[in-house]
Amino acid sequence: MSSLASLIKTKLKLPDSSKNLNKLRWKFRLLESQFALYSLPCQLRFVHYNNLEDPNSFNGLLYLFTDYIAFQGDDESNQFCMPYTIIRKVSRVKSNDLEQLLSVSTSNGYEYRISLQVSETTAAHFCQLLREELVSHKADMQRSSEFSKQFFSERLCKPNVPEPETKDSYGFGARYGYPTDPRISRERAKLRMWKEYFLLYGANLSLIRVSLFSKLVRIELPNKLRGEIWELTSGSMYFRLENSDEYDHLLKVYSGQTSFSLEEIEKDLGRSLPEYPAYQNEEGINALRNVLVAFSWKNQEVGYCQAMNIVAAALLIHCTEEQTFFLMHKICEDYIPGYYSKTMYGTLIDQQVYESLVQRSMPNLHAHFVSKDIQLSIISLPWFLSLFLCTMPLPYAFRLLDFFFLEGPRVLFQIGMAILYDNEAEIMKATEDTMLISILKNYFSSLGDKAYKDATDKRVASITKFQLLLVTAFKKFSHITHSLIEDERKKHYEGVMNSIESFAKRTQIRSLQNYGTLTRTDLSNIYDRYHEVLSSKHRVGLGSSTDTRLEFDEFCIFLAGVTEWAKGLDAAAINNSSSFLRHLFLRFDKSMTGSLSLQDLVSGIAELKFRDVMRNISFIFELYDFNGDGFMDKPDVLKVSEAILWLTRFMGDEYLSAVSEFIQRCFHFADEASPDGHSDTLIDISDHMSSTGSENRSVGANSDIKVSLPTFRMVVLSIGLLEQLFSGGLADSIVLAPVQEKSSTTGGLRGLLDSLVIDTNRIGKTFRGHKPASRPSTANGTSNQNTTSEITTSETTATEKTPSNSSDTEDDVGDVVENDKDLLQFDPYKKNDA
């Protein structure tokens, strides 16, 4: 950082910890690559399309990130985040002791006024730093300008913007029909309100959020805008902008390659929303395949998990393939991390969080589940894993996705709690899992029905069960915030991870073979230490790899934990290619991959722990008989002697003389090698053992010798200390003590793990057999009366009585009319609603 930047940093308010930085990133939905460089207080104003300055202004903080400028108002609903590359011009309008006013113009024609609430000197320094950032991003400005032109908001506000080249720029729904009937949902009225909003407060990359933005999202997004607003509210729009060529690149680079994930994807393609027309032909199936395949290569640690196909298939109805790909990444990384990992640890953590919330908020219902042995997680897990797309009719599930991307994962918990709350009386009658499933299935299929059939008040009588669900979720359970969910996730994290790891441990230990005389306790201790060594780069519960292996340096660390002779190694000892540990590692590596699996390690230790002197002598001999010809040459004998000295360096000086005697006897009894490398004659052991003094045969210093296994065995057995070492001392030096115990696991999780985590067939049946609660209506199909998701209590106006195919394809929607505004009357967040 330059000296100027350092000076400014001392004067401006910056995040003082990584925790605060992560909160800022989440607030603006930015990637981990973004760092908050500077911030300062300011006041934000707007200059509208008619060049009139908006009388309203918003106080807050202005942030400079690595690639973005952002604003967060004192009122949480007021904010913006836009890339530097969308900014065409920044100029100082006026400057005095009270304010330093900047004018910011974007490449798509919007202008904003920012009043810096700092001294003139600080403002000047800030402007210089902003200028440096803009200059450094200048090369990408044209790309951002072209990027913004693809959005429907551009065409809605600027009729001269040409149609996008991609035929599915607004998802499959534009051609195959959207699940939401545009006439019933008053599509054109909503488009008019969004058009007015875009003209006032900017669009796509340059959009400013005010309180009206969230309200427009909550009353249901128009079909053609849904994908764009999902991208904006989730932050995947920024991710796609920064990696605009990645999706096509992945499909091209990995074309023709195979993996286990691809095999699983193929199994599920035909089971992904099969009732939707686009997935009844190859076009839709190919698009879904492309998204899932690209995602599996992009996130190879995750690959593919069942239920991802349901989510991706639903997103494609409103989004392009590329949009869906980046939305999936954002969902998996930021919104519900760990849901689609190999162990589904994120789902299991959230199930614990959900059950704890139920216990606190609805104790009677929780007690009923416990008394009747009803496993709530068996019912709720598919809700969370499929984002309710697997259980609700699509029009309602899409409404929940609108809230989900806007508000974050807390929406899943709020809706989950509201479902139980609104059905508590019926649920209390359930005595087993199947009854609960039946009750909720009937509920989901009737979400379009009136909630208060006997009400005399017209407005109350018009409220549907789905509207009531939203009111319950966002009012009754408004205390469920993003911070609360994050804190609860942290609270349950270790317990869930330990449970998963304990389950995985039991499963893997049962599959081990060739463990000789090792006990179950020994295997357990080896497993624990093995994964303890690997914990710095991998944790079993995260499921990031199915084949974790020890490299050589990690193997040395492992042995240091179970033997005295492997402790205190320096870099030279570890890097010595001729060391005993290197020979031992190569011996353990049966598959010759350069790393050790748990099975390799167990089999190797079982050999070392076998208390048989003849077998142990053969083991050491084979370590140094590299070519497997049954003989050791002179350098090999010296290496064995060095290994014995190294192994016994903590056992006493008497081994020095024993090793010296070992060398002498090996040389004494060895045969000189013939030209073909084999000894000429066998040694007559009885004659040599009786020879003394000058009768002993000496091998020349430069002679090639060969020591056979029988000779090696005879020499070792003739030296008492070495016989003791090989008969039991080596085995006893390996102490398989337990690793320090982890904290106890969460009580009710083991049953869930037993039935769900490993039992993939059961999960597969849940999603592969997916049928919606009721078939969704499409723009070119028949509407189902139970899938109506209107949220207005007024009747459809004459302006909306146009054919569905016309109302949904005509982009010239006109200006907002008075009747449009009654859409805003019902808002589940308002305090005075029923």
Swiss-Prot record:
GO MF, one example: GTPase activator activity
Location within or outside the cell: Cytoplasm
SUPFAM superfamilies: EF-hand, Ypt/Rab-GAP domain of gyp1p
SMART domains hit by this protein: TBC
InterPro entries (UniProt xref): EF-hand-dom_pair (IPR011992), EF_Hand_1_Ca_BS (IPR018247), EF_hand_dom (IPR002048), Rab-GAP-TBC_dom (IPR000195), Rab-GAP_TBC_sf (IPR035969), Rab_GAP_TBC_domain (IPR050302)
Coiled-coil parts of chain: none
Domain EF-hand residue range list: 576-611, 612-647
Repeat keyword on record: yes
Disulfide cross-links: none
Sequence positions that bind Ca(2+) 2: D625, N627, D629, D636
Binding locations of Ca(2+) 1: D589, S591, T593, S595, D600
Source taxon at top rank: Eukaryota
Spans through the membrane: none
GO CC term, one of those recorded: cell division site
GO BP terms in the entry: vesicle-mediated transport
Residue stretches of biased makeup (Acidic residues): 808-817
Annotated region described as Disordered, given as residue ranges: 766-834
Alphabetical keyword list: Calcium, Cytoplasm, GTPase activation, Metal-binding, Repeat
Annotated ranges, domain Rab-GAP TBC: 220-408
Pfam family, one: RabGAP-TBC
Compositional bias ranges of the Basic and acidic residues kind: 818-834
Functional summary from the UniProt entry: May act as a GTPase-activating protein for Rab family protein(s).
Protein name (Swiss-Prot/TrEMBL): TBC domain-containing protein C215.01
Lineage, opening ranks: Eukaryota, Fungi, Dikarya, Ascomycota, Taphrinomycotina
